[in-house]
Swiss-Prot record:
Keywords: Cytoplasm, Endonuclease, Hydrolase, Manganese, Metal-binding, Nuclease. One of its GO terms (cellular component) is cytoplasm. GO terms for molecular function: manganese ion binding; RNA binding; RNA-DNA hybrid ribonuclease activity. This is Ribonuclease HII. A divalent metal cation binds at residues 10-11, 106. It comes from Polynucleobacter necessarius subsp. necessarius (strain STIR1). Residues 4-197 form the RNase H type-2 domain. Its EC number is 3.1.26.4. Its main location: cytoplasm. InterPro entries: RNase_HII, RNase_HII/HIII, RNase_HII/HIII_dom, RNaseH-like_sf, RNaseH_sf. Its cofactor is Mn(2+); Mg(2+). It comes from the Bacteria. HAMAP family: RNase_HII_B.
Amino acid sequence: MSIIWVCGVDEAGRGPLVGAVVAGAVVLDPNNPIEGLKDSKKLTAARREYLYEQIMEKAKAWGVGEASPTEIDEINILQATMLAMRRAIEDLATRLGAWPDKALIDGNRCPELPIAAEAIIKGDTKEPAISAASIVAKVTRDRQMMSLHERHPEYGFAQHMGYPTEAHFAALKQYGACDQHRRCFSPVRKALESVAS
């Protein structure tokens, strides 16, 4: 009997004004379970980091994909999210040595894939593989934001991870946008217009 590999897929970073949208894809190993998987948004940063390391160690395979701020500006955030998810599954397939048999996607739509896929609304609370993918995506993106904070501390990315907050709006107004800001997002566009005028 052949084993059926099902991968969970989720994204992090659709809402922020800056940085890539990142997707994770994970095939869990039923013989090597990971305790405590749940939606990454409901976990502390320390717990996410711990579970991320557990996933790296115990999952059958995992993958990460992203779409850059430039790609987000060119094709819009929804299409960029689908692109990041497809890239994450491709990365996972490379590590697994084969395409998974099926992808379970968090949300209400699936990217175009060469395998069966099912969209599951609130899938990160229903499917452990999607929860694991959520953790991989969130930790990867948070690490990118911490790195970006080192390059641009004036924006306070370490505090808000690029999300639209009063502090982020104030920094945009004072400093304009950095090279990683998403120009197609209204608050960034307005900041650029006010700096230009």
